[in-house]
Amino acid sequence: MLYNSPVHLFNARMSKSVCLFNREDLAKVYLPVGQMLQIDRVLSIEGPEIHAEMDLVGHWVFPLHFPNDPVFPGCLLIEAAGQLVAIWGWHAQLKGNPRMAKVSANFLRPIIPEQGVITLKSKIQIKRHVVRGNVQVFAGGELAAEIEPVIVIVKE
């Protein structure tokens, strides 16, 4: 269920989030959990825009993905972008379960652990139960990827 948590603090009538959401907060709502939760913090939600971060330092993927040449995998960037759009949908009080229906991605440069933090910024468009994000992914202060996830909110 989408809104089964007492920490659900989103309010669609507000122009901005009342607080920051950290990994612990996000794990209490309907999202992937454990290692598959890619978003570490939501910094702001204002109208159709959402801004979040994920930490690279100590991320579980680096020892496993090209251990001697660690590069953050594009599939996890796509997952993070989908989670970002789903979080915005919850903020807008869309009821149902989010499902990634389609995605396009353009990877511009590799992301490595020394860059410290990945920043995700998105502008959202919504039409009925379909939510589309235009997500820009920054690492080391530079644009690293552009991802366009399309999330369908499936009614319960």
Residue ranges of model-derived segments:
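Flexible, low-complexity linker/boundary loops enriched in proline and small hydrophobic residues
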Residues: L2-L43, I50, I151
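Hydrophobic beta-strand-centered segment that forms part of the acyl-chain substrate-binding groove
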Residues: N11-A12, S17-L20, L84-T119, I124-I126, ...
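Catalytic strand-loop segment that frames the active site of acyl-thioester-processing enzymes
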Residues: V33-F72
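Intrinsic-disorder/low-complexity, polar/charged segments enriched in Ser/Thr/Lys/Arg/Asp/Glu/Gln
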Residues: L37, G47-H51, V117-T119, V130-R132, ...
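Compact, glycine-rich, soluble single-domain proteins
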Residues: L64-A86
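Flexible glycine-rich active-site/ligand-binding loops centered on an Asp-His dyad
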Residues: F72, E142-E156
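Core beta-strand residues in small-molecule sensory/regulatory alpha/beta domains
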Residues: Q136-F138
